[in-house]
Each structure stands twice: as structure tokens, then as C-alpha cells.
């Protein structure tokens, strides 16, 4: 188990205070392990095991507590036997009907510190905003970054890792934490990733949104997977189905894709007019949370290397807390405009800069951008081709850089 220090740095200031800590993210991204890491830190501070009260609602043992009233009654009983502050951990809380009422009552009635996890962005919408508005802080937990992937691979392994070889595996298998237990067994990894995908689709998309046409959903997902990092519209998908003699309204397509985004399977990036600093409402792009899932479900990661490298960089920017958009500057496009508070960077991603035309095209994306924020061109090339103040970085080095500036 690695420490996942980037997340712990975000969570640590809130440990022990009255705000409810909400950990969200796609299933199997490591939210339960984060709860264990938090417990470990509390134990190091002198908190006893008797002060921890834990519910995992994926376990049948806790099925009898899957209503707000039943859970609150059980909490009351357990907390009565605790000396001092209670530390409450609820894993996959969305399985509890009207859970927000129970959590809010616990916050008000008991001396406690509350941590919850869930696998859907809707966890923090609707009624929860009414019950807990301003009283919670959210942390999205993602699959392993390349840095975390390497950290995990180094555990229990003698000698130096080959960064180049490991990155090839990372492109293929992705960063779902459990894969480290499979020791690079590709067949087992693909089976596991397909199971994760099926679980997400069934529990967090179909069941949660009452989707009846599962075949249509999966065909839409396949279309999005094929077009990761490419511009498309709901109407273009609708026309695609029309060519196959199937009528599907663009609104239905948008609703299905949004349901997948709510389950943290896809992330939508809007287009930004850099000069006018306006968000445009057309030509969004979608990226998948983990490239290994794409390989398991769709296949072709090595065939679509330009798309996959772009996807990996996009998710790394999001993972580090940046708000990411696609940059439009005149007739040219910058892959990513990433902003985090006062920090801002531009990133252009390419597979290989194998010709002068390729170099001119990628660096030329910045021709009309006159500000002084850092600008990067990232590719698999090892030779540094930086020019005109624009930094060229090998993608492996870029992903392993602690701070971009």
C-alpha cells in the first residue's frame, strides 16, 4: 500500500475538524484504501481503535443498515460505548436510502469526525446540498498516476526499473490500483478491468439512472471510446445510428454520456476562446478516466497512440487539481489550457515530432498566444526541441515532474 501523498496533503488539514470529508471517484480507484491511510494517520496521533466506527455498504453484513433510520440507530448504539470523539467511516454511502439525513443528524448530535466515500458525482447534488451545504469538503480519488504506478512497482522489487518499459505497460494497462497484485499478467489484468467496467456501468450508470436500453448505452460508450480526444457532437452520434437504421435523439445520447461522466468514467472538456477568455458551448471533447479500461473494453491503445498520450496528460492535469479546457486561438487549437488558482499552463501533446512539419505544427499552436504563462509541447521524443520560450518535454519526464513552471 503506497501513501498517495498528493491526496493526503489535501485531506490532512481537514482531519479532526467538523467538516464532512467526502471521497468520490470511479469504483476501484482506491477510495477505501484512502480511508485506511486516514485511519493510520489518526492512530499515529494517538487515536485508539475503539474510536473508529466503520461501515462498508458493499458488504452484505451491513445490508440491514441501508436506511437512514436503521443506520442512525446503530450509530447511536455504537457511539454510546466510545470514550471521546468518534471517527466515522462510511464506504459507498450511496447504498443507504436517504443517507444524507443520517449523516447530517450524526454531525449535529454526536462528537464525531465523519468520512464518506461514493462512486457517483450526483452524491453531492440535490438533497445533499440542502442538508450539508457548506459543511463538507470533497476529494476526487483517481486511478494511479504514472508516478504512483512506479512507486507501487518499486515496492518489493530489487534493482532499477526501466522507466521506458514501465510506461509502455502503463499505456496498455492503466493505473487501477489492484492491478499491482496481478504482477503484469496482461490476461488477468484485462479480465479485471472488464469487470470494473461492467460494475461501473451496471451499478453507477444503468441502475442509478434507470436506463432500460443497455445495448444503446454500450454502443454510445464504444463511440466515445473510439473518439477519445476527438471533437464530436450528440448529433454526429445520432447520424451515425441513423446510418444503421436506428433513430436515437441527440438528447438521449447526451443524457447517457452525462450518466457516464457522473460515474467518473468520462470527463468532458469544454472549448475556451483564449483571447476572449470565454467558454464556448460547442465542440467539447471527452477523455476516459483510465486508459487501461479503454484497452480492456475497446482495444487499440497502441494503435491510437496520439489519443492515448493526450488522454494520459489530460488526466494528470485533472488529477493535480487543474481546471482543464481546450484552447482556441484564432484558427489554431491548443490541446489543454490548465488553470489552478493563479497558476496557468498550456500543454500541446504529440506522439512523435518526426518531421519539420510536425515540429512546426505543434509549436505553431502557440503563435497567437501572447501571454507569459508556461507553454509545453509534450511527446515521446527524447531529444529536447524547445524553442522560442516553448518547452519541449518527453512525456515520461513531464508526468514525473513535481511542479510545472
Mark where each language-model region is.
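Hydrophobic positions on the alpha1 helix immediately C-terminal to the Walker A/P-loop
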Residues: 34, 38
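Short glycine-rich substrate-engagement loop in P-loop NTPases that contacts/grips substrate
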Residues: 54-84
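Pre-Walker A adenine-sensing motif
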Residues: 2-16
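Conserved lysine of the Walker
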Residues: 31
Amino acid at each position: 500500500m503506497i501513501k498517495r501523498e498528493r491526496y493526503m496533503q489535501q485531506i490532512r488539514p481537514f482531519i479532526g475538524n467538523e467538516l464532512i470529508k467526502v471521497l468520490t471517484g470511479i469504483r476501484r480507484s482506491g477510495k477505501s484504501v484512502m480511508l485506511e491511510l486516514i485511519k493510520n494517520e489518526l492512530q499515529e496521533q494517538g487515536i485508539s481503535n475503539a474510536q473508529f466506527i466503520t461501515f462498508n455498504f458493499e458488504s452484505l453484513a451491513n445490508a440491514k443498515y441501508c436506511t437512514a433510520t436503521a443506520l442512525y440507530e446503530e450509530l447511536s448504539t455504537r457511539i454510546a460505548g466510545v470514550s471521546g470523539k468518534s471517527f466515522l467511516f462510511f464506504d459507498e454511502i450511496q447504498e443507504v436510502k436517504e443517507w444524507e439525513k443520517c449523516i447530517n443528524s450524526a454531525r449535529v448530535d454526536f462528537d464525531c469526525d465523519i468520512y464518506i466515500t461514493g462512486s457517483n458525482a450526483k452524491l453531492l447534488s440535490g438533497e445533499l446540498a440542502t442538508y450539508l451545504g457548506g459543511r463538507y469538503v470533497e476529494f476526487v480519488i483517481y486511478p494511479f498516476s504514472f508516478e504512483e504506478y512506479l512507486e507501487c512497482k518499486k515496492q518489493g522489487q530489487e534493482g532499477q526499473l526501466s522507466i521506458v518499459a514501465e510506461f509502455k505497460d502503463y499505456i496498455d494497462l492503466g493505473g487501477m490500483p489492484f492491478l499491482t497484485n496481478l504482477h503484469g499478467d496482461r490476461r488477468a489484468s484485462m479480465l479485471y478491468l472488464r469487470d470494473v467496467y461492467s460494475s461501473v456501468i451496471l451499478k453507477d450508470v444503468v441502475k442509478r439512472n434507470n436506463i432500460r436500453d443497455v445495448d444503446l448505452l454500450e454502443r454510445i460508450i464504444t463511440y466515445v471510446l473510439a473518439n477519445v480526444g476527438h471533437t464530436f457532437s450528440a448529433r454526429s452520434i445520432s447520424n451515425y445510428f441513423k446510418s444503421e437504421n436506428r433513430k436515437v435523439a441527440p438528447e438521449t445520447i447526451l443524457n447517457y454520456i452525462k450518466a457516464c461522466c457522473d460515474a467518473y468514467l468520462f470527463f468532458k472538456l469544454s472549448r475556451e476562446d483564449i483571447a476572449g477568455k470565454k467558454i464556448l458551448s460547442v465542440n467539447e471533447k471527452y477523455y476516459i478516466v483510465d486508459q487501461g479500461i479503454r484497452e480492456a473494453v475497446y482495444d487499440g491503445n497502441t494503435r491510437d497512440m496520439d489519443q492515448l498520450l493526450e488522454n494520459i496528460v489530460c488526466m494528470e492535469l485533472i488529477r493535480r487539481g487543474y481546471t482543464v479546457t481546450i484552447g482556441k486561438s484564432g484558427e489554431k487549437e491548443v490541446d489543454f489550457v490548465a488553470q489552478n488558482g493563479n497558476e496557468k499552463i498550456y500543454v500541446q501533446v504529440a506522439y512523435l515530432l518526426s518531421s519539420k512539419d510536425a515540429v512546426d505544427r505543434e509549436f505553431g499552436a502557440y503563435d497567437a498566444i501572447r501571454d507569459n504563462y508556461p507553454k509545453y509541447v509534450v511527446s515521446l521524443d527524447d531529444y529536447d526541441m524547445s524553442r522560442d520560450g516553448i518547452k519541449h518535454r518527453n512525456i515520461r519526464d513531464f508526468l514525473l515532474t513535481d511542479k510545472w513552471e
